[in-house]
Amino acid sequence: MVAAGKTLAPSAPRRRVPWVPDRQSVIWIDCNPQVGREMKDVHPFLVLSPRVFNERTSLVIGLPMTTAHYNADNPFAVSAGTSPSGRKTGKTSYVLCHQPKSFDWRIRGAKAHPIGILPEAVFAQACERLNQIIQLGG
């Protein structure tokens, strides 16, 4: 209750927290420029680096994703399930664990992907597959 003659201080405007990619998120990122047979244009990208790193450095470390069917036989591609909507509806998405990359996500205009957060089991499998190649820790 407010006493007579007193007014409530206006509440501070809510600050909108800027979006920053986080570990285990799928984002859209522009892979251009590219060289040779590298993936080009805008593609989904699985984020491996933690939010605090991404925010402070403007870099994001992760793995590109594709719906190219020939990856079904690729031992370093992990199936991430089927696309629920959009022009790729019903197509299987693959995380390409043999192609780790880093990008400046701010400069490249990264955006959240409709997939959102990759399921824990799929994320763990992608990390394990990558570690078979780079053999971190141990």
Description of each model-found segment:
Residues 1-138:
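Conserved functional hotspots at enzyme active or ligand-binding sites that engage polyanionic ligands
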